[in-house]
Every structure is written in structure tokens, then in C-alpha cells.
Swiss-Prot record:
Record key words, sorted: DNA-binding, Transcription, Transcription regulation
Pfam families: TetR_C_13_2, TetR_N
Feature: DNA-binding region: 30-49
Family annotation (SUPFAM superfamilies): Homeodomain-like, Tetracyclin repressor-like, C-terminal domain
Highest taxon listed in the record's lineage: Bacteria
Keyword Transcription regulation carried by entry: yes
Key word Membrane present: no
Residue ranges constituting the HTH tetR-type domain according to the UniProt record: 7-67
Protein name as catalogued: Uncharacterized HTH-type transcriptional regulator in lacX 3'region
GO molecular function: DNA binding
Length: 196
């Protein structure tokens, strides 16, 4: 029972940290914010995390694991058609935002924007995640085009930029139709690649 409570407390702190950073940013989130949100004391926070930075690194690690499970090793690694995989990638991202009332942007993209230039410890896992995503998208594009994966890396990079740009526009407009419209255009471009 005690082990469950300890794990539960750590998860509660991690979840609150993730949500606060998503909404307020890393700089805008204080340890006191996390303590208030979780109704825990400093001792409990510092039992699990040495610092706010360490808690944020755990948040990044959690995002990486989710993306690896659902997107990199899931959707983009399926034996379905590569066109279906690429479209499903967009649907997965869209569905995460469609259920929200306020659009804060991409949780990972927000971390990249705020933290990549501040600290290598933050930048490295985020860069690796985007590099892995680029490779998986390129693999699917290669199956569509017949070109080598390395030949499709620039196009995969551009797709990531379009996705992140669309999420940035969603954040600034607070209009889900913007994301839907941009993703529909991306899906159409995937179909055109598949026709060649």
C-alpha cells in the first residue's frame, strides 16, 4: 500500500508539472505552483526530484515515451499503407487537440521553443525525438516514392515544420478549423506523392 502511495504521489507531481509547464511554460511554472496544484509539501517534491529542472526532464522523458509508443513504434511503424500511416499520424495529433477547450499548442513543440536554447540537457532528448520522427516519416515517404530514406529526410523535415507551424497557428488563433484545414492540405499533399 505504501509503495502505491509513493508511486501515486510521484505520478501526481509529474502530471501536475506536465500540465503546468504546458499551460504556463517552464519559466512561468514555479515549484510552489506544483506544490499548490498537487497539495504536496516541498519534502515530497524533493523526495522525487532534485530540482524543477529534473522534474521537467521527467516530463520530457514522459512525452518521448508517449510519442515512441503511439507514433514512432505505433502508427508510423504499422504494416498498413504508408499513406494511411502518414494520415493517421495527423489524425493522432489532431485528436489530442480536438478535445481541448483552450489550445496551448504542441506540448513537445512548446518545450522545444522555450528550452532548446537554454540548456543542452533539455535540447538533446527533444532533438532526438524530432530526429526519430523525421526518420519514421521519411521511411513512410520512401515506401510511397520508391526513393531512399535519406533522400526523403528533407521532405520529412518540412512535414514536421508544417505540423508544428499548424499547431502554432492553432495556438494563436484558438480556432480548431485552422488545424483541420492545414492537416487536410497535408493529407492531400501525401496523396499526390503517392500518385507519382
Amino acid at each position: 500500500m505504501e509503495v502505491y502511495n509513493l508511486r501515486n504521489t510521484k505520478e501526481k507531481i509529474l502530471t501536475a508539472t506536465e500540465q503546468l509547464i504546458y499551460k504556463k511554460g517552464y519559466t512561468g511554472t514555479s515549484i510552489n505552483d506544483i506544490l499548490d496544484e498537487t497539495a504536496t509539501g516541498k519534502g515530497q517534491f524533493y523526495y522525487y526530484f532534485d530540482s524543477k529542472k529534473e522534474a521537467c526532464l521527467a516530463v520530457i522523458d514522459n512525452h518521448v515515451k508517449i510519442w515512441q509508443k503511439h507514433l514512432l513504434n505505433g502508427i508510423l511503424s504499422r504494416d498498413e499503407s504508408p499513406l494511411a500511416n502518414l494520415k493517421e499520424m495527423l489524425d493522432w495529433i489532431y485528436s489530442d487537440h480536438a478535445q481541448k477547450k483552450i489550445y496551448y499548442g504542441c506540448p513537445v513543440g512548446n518545450l522545444v521553443i522555450e528550452l532548446s536554447a537554454l540548456d543542452e540537457d533539455f535540447r538533446k532528448p527533444l532533438e532526438q525525438l524530432f530526429s526519430d520522427l523525421q526518420k519514421k516519416i521519411a521511411e513512410n515517404l520512401s515506401a510511397l516514392t520508391g526513393l531512399l530514406v535519406k533522400q526523403n529526410l528533407p521532405a520529412a523535415h518540412a512535414i514536421i515544420a508544417q505540423i508544428q507551424g499548424s499547431l502554432l497557428l492553432l495556438k494563436v488563433t484558438q480556432d480548431l478549423n485552422v488545424l483541420e484545414s492545414n492537416f487536410d492540405l497535408l493529407k492531400t499533399s501525401f496523396e499526390k506523392v503517392g500518385e507519382k
